[in-house]
């Protein structure tokens, strides 16, 4: 059990740092491209991991840990609320559509591609 917690912690530490860099580099305009990038790529990678049926150790380190901290639901919701409050309705709809539609599509694509590595 302690080794599982350590794996999740190490992965989470690394994932959070990588997400921080994406946000700092890409979230400079009206549309939060950094958050969009980490959430879409995270959906794809987690789908690929699930499709590949990786070991528990790898899943804890990379899936639960790294990708759990790399992707962000709370920041997404905050940014969506901010777009609405700033009356950026078109950007809100675009951001929401790309995030949810793209996330589901990329998770499915990742799962399908990952299944070739079983």
Curated annotation (Swiss-Prot):
Q: Where in the cell is it found?
A: Cell membrane
- What is its biological role? Fluoride-specific ion channel. Important for reducing fluoride concentration in the cell, thus reducing its toxicity.
- Which organism does this sequence originate in? Desulfitobacterium hafniense (strain Y51)
Q: Which UniProt keywords apply?
A: Cell membrane, Ion channel, Ion transport, Membrane, Metal-binding, Sodium, Transmembrane, Transmembrane helix, Transport
This protein is called what? Fluoride-specific ion channel FluC 2
Query: What is a biological process (GO) this protein takes part in?
Result: cellular detoxification of fluoride
GO cellular component, alphabetical, reads: plasma membrane
Binding annotation for Na(+): 68, 71
Reaction(s) catalysed (UniProt annotation): fluoride(in) = fluoride(out)
Asked whether the keyword Nucleotide-binding is assigned, the reply is no
Annotated GO molecular function terms are: fluoride channel activity; metal ion binding
The record lists the membrane-crossing segments as: 2-22, 31-51, 56-76, 91-111
Q: Does the keyword Transport apply?
A: yes
How the protein is activated or inhibited is described as: Na(+) is not transported, but it plays an essential structural role and its presence is essential for fluoride channel function.
What membrane topology is given? Multi-pass membrane protein
Q: Which family does the UniProt entry place this protein in?
A: Belongs to the fluoride channel Fluc/FEX (TC 1.A.43) family.
């Amino acid at each position: 059990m302690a080794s599982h917690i350590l794996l999740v912690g190490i992965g989470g530490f690394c994932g959070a740092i990588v997400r921080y860099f994406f946000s700092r580099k890409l979230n400079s305009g009206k549309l939060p491209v950094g958050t969009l990038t980490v959430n879409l790529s995270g959906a794809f990678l987690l789908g690929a991991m699930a499709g590949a049926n990786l070991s528990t150790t790898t899943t804890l380190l990379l899936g639960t840990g790294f990708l759990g901290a790399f992707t962000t639901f709370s920041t997404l919701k905050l940014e969506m609320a901010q777009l609405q409050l700033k009356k950026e309705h078109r950007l809100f709809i675009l951001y929401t559509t790309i995030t949810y539609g793209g996330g589901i599509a990329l998770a499915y694509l990742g799962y399908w591609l990952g299944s070739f590595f079983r």
